[in-house]
């Protein structure tokens, strides 16, 4: 039966946001079309009828960009959208993180949330429209969901917070913050900032939450009218009798095992307990072996959380605000442009910095207005880092997300293109993992850039904070390790310099957190960050003064934009000839800035001289040292510089009359001449006569002066 179409609207951050329900995608469990400005996003939510036999909740969130939304045709031969862009992947994660904690515990039905950008207005964020659409699609559906949630982007210009700023406003802003949450609490934060103090970041988060409350109230009105009755679902529960039996036989030994400080020894002890219990119950056909494993893992989680919240004891024995042992090194790889190794306990990251010409920038093909990217940070997480085997695949969402977080943290201190005309690529290889690998990669990448001689504004370090909340007990943890991340309630990553925050990322597994928790986490993170920066500065306290001998050397010059065509030549013949002669790379900007790069400084200079000669303009009144290239009866043609000749008329060769040019010059002679005129046709007239006259008069004055002195 057709649903009735409903439309709702609200003024949100200075633009109209409207929601349409009941017209599109009616076979989905829930579907809404969100319009924000000229942006239009269709969000749908569907769920399987039966639960899956899995130990986790199978939720998939996809944010899909259609290039027709921006009036573009995809590039390449196939001419259709391929794999999602990095921006689309990051937005999918951005939507997934705040909605995932709001499904019922034990819910195992397959849920898929899809948002398709159908019209893109760069001044009206499609990401925020998709987040609201995803929340509403779930809320109006029959899928169990404890929403709604909403998200907002917060900027700050001249000390004032701006909600959902335009790209132009974000360029001026010192904060680019996305915050999401429910009516009661915040449950997701993602931010980049220009060394902003912690208290300002906190106020920005809270300002965003106030705006979120208005959007949630709007969604609740939509759900009142359009919401379906929630279906009855089968939640996964454990057999009470089996749980009691396992608690009696294994709980005590598990409590001992989780107190083992070393990661692998602790995990081996837990694995042995689980294997013994599985063996003990394997003959009983009424018992599901997988359920035995899940119950025992639940006991591990309970004990770890109890120790942290009640006894303030961490799995490795550290204090709640204690950082694991630190180590920082540089220059491990001699042929790379820069390298840094950062180790924190059993987490280790090796980062390599590579410098390239501006022609090496990444070209972006998406809905965004940004066409290229000069600074890149890539993150790799091989299986050996956790002592396991596994297939080697292309980077997944996690790797892309961690790489982007590091990029956001570091790009705030990258020098401008004018200060440092290089493309910068960082690759972080995680060699050991026991939590906080993304933050270790930030530290290692800072070391690598300083080793490479990149003049960063300040060193950046990152640290991951955790939270475990059990009943009335709550503990904020500094520098969480793998087990604390997996079994805790919050992963709050904070990166920054000694002056302030450059990036934040917060994910939580509970419904939300309040101001007090955020304040405490930010303060502990600041203290931890300062300790880490101190350790890093022992390895290298400032960027190297010179680049690696293996890094390209770049020369910069500026030419008249009207002369760019002279440097490029017809079909690129001129510029290709220069490149062939010198072996350099040449990049020319529309404003006339020319970048010449190669490993050979001499070849850079040669290419620069060729280009300067090509674009050099003759100036009337200037004196040039030229060469006679052609002799005619009426005068000599003199090459002033490559590509530019002038006529030295026979009457302008000498002060006295001469009969033949050949009486004074032969081909190849070098001569000083002055430009006396450039006519309407661009022809250059020269004179040697005026220079000879000036020299004679100067000599006569000096002789007269000498005579007077006698």
Curated annotation (Swiss-Prot):
EC number: 2.7.7.8
Binding site residues for Mg(2+): 485, 491
Domain S1 motif: 621-689
Molecular function GO terms recorded: 3'-5'-RNA exonuclease activity; magnesium ion binding; polyribonucleotide nucleotidyltransferase activity; RNA binding
GO CC terms: cytosol
Domain KH: 552-611
Classification via InterPro entries: ExoRNase_PH_dom1 (IPR001247), ExoRNase_PH_dom2 (IPR015847), ExoRNase_PH_dom2_sf (IPR036345), KH_dom (IPR004087), KH_dom_type_1 (IPR004088), KH_dom_type_1_sf (IPR036612), NA-bd_OB-fold (IPR012340), PNPase (IPR012162)
Pfam families with a match to the protein in the record: KH_1, PNPase, RNase_PH, RNase_PH_C, S1
GO BP term (any one): mRNA catabolic process
Cofactor: Mg(2+)
Localization of this protein: Cytoplasm
SUPFAM superfamilies hit by this protein: Eukaryotic type KH-domain (KH-domain type I), Nucleic acid-binding proteins, Ribonuclease PH domain 2-like, Ribosomal protein S5 domain 2-like
Keyword DNA-binding: no
Reaction(s) catalysed (UniProt annotation): RNA(n+1) + phosphate = RNA(n) + a ribonucleoside 5'-diphosphate
Keyword set, alphabetical order: Cytoplasm, Magnesium, Metal-binding, Nucleotidyltransferase, RNA-binding, Transferase
Leading EC class: transferase
NCBIfam families to which the protein is assigned, alphabetical: polynuc_phos, PRK11824.1
Family, similarity comment: Belongs to the polyribonucleotide nucleotidyltransferase family.
Known role: Involved in mRNA degradation. Catalyzes the phosphorolysis of single-stranded polyribonucleotides processively in the 3'- to 5'-direction.
Protein name: Polyribonucleotide nucleotidyltransferase
Organism: Shouchella clausii (strain KSM-K16) (Alkalihalobacillus clausii)
